[in-house]
Structures are given as structure tokens and as C-alpha cells.
Amino acid sequence: MHEGKNAKYVVDTPKKNAKYPSYRVKNDPKVVKPIVQVDADTVPGAEFYAETKWILPGDKKEIKLCESHTHNFGEMLGFFGYNYDDIQDLGAEIEITIDNEKHKVTKSFTAFVPPGVQHGPVIIRNIVRPIFHVSSGPTKVYK
């Protein structure tokens, strides 16, 4: 636990009792590992949410993170490979659908999804190295 008047702004543990909408797929915690989440539940006064997690190689050939859905806010999604020799190498293939258009990506990337635009599913295939995932949007709590 951090001390001081601003310690409440430092988050270093996963969000306890996190609740997610039904379109978020529950994954094996040995493979998809939450790091931290900033939102109005974890940081008083937060005006946005940001969620981070590691996605690790495992037994499954495919991991689905979410089904198709929309938000009333824009969302940034980022996926970054863990290859020191080539930081652009994702170490997997990610299929992300945005507005019914499928994109297959094998490089580290970010995507912005405008408010009201359908996105998902997000499917990760052939993971050979850890992937750092971040998502963020201008909403106090992810819904």
C-alpha cells in the first residue's frame, strides 16, 4: 500500500470483484492475466477507464476476448508483442472485427473504435510469446 495524500491515484493490483458485460468472454486466468485497471471504482474521480493485461501462450490455439458489441464512447485497443529483437512482431495473429470488417494483424498495433461502431469478436490465434494488452476509453467505468 502506498502512503501519502496522493496514494489513492496509484493502482498496483488488479481490480477486485471486477464485473464485465456478457459480451466479454471469460478466459483461463493462467493465460489471460489482468494487471491493473483504472476507473471510477479504483481511483476516486477518474474520468476514463484503462485496463491492462498479459495474454500468455497456452494450450489453446485460439482465445476469444469478446463477442460483437458497441459502446456509446470511443475505445482504444492496443496489443503489443514481447520480442526484444523485433518490437513490431506481435508473436500471434489477432483477428479484430470493426463494423463487420475483419482485420488480421500480426504486428504490434493499436485500434481506435469510434462511439457507436460495432466491434468484435476479437480472436487471438497461434500465440508464441506474451502479448501486452491495453484498452481505454472516456467512460468512468467500462460497460
Model-inferred region functions:
Residues 1-66:
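A short, N-terminal "cap"/entry segment at the start of jelly-roll beta-barrel domains
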Residues 61-77, 89-91, 98:
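A short beta-loop-beta micro-motif enriched in histidine and acidic residues
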Residues 74, 82, 115-117:
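Short, flexible loop/turn elements at secondary-structure junctions
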Residues 79-106:
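A short beta-strand-loop-beta hairpin characteristic of the jelly-roll/cupin
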Residues 83-85, 118-120, 139-141:
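Short Gly/Pro-enriched loop/turn and capping motifs at secondary-structure junctions
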Residues 126-143:
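A short hydrophobic beta-strand segment most commonly corresponding to one strand
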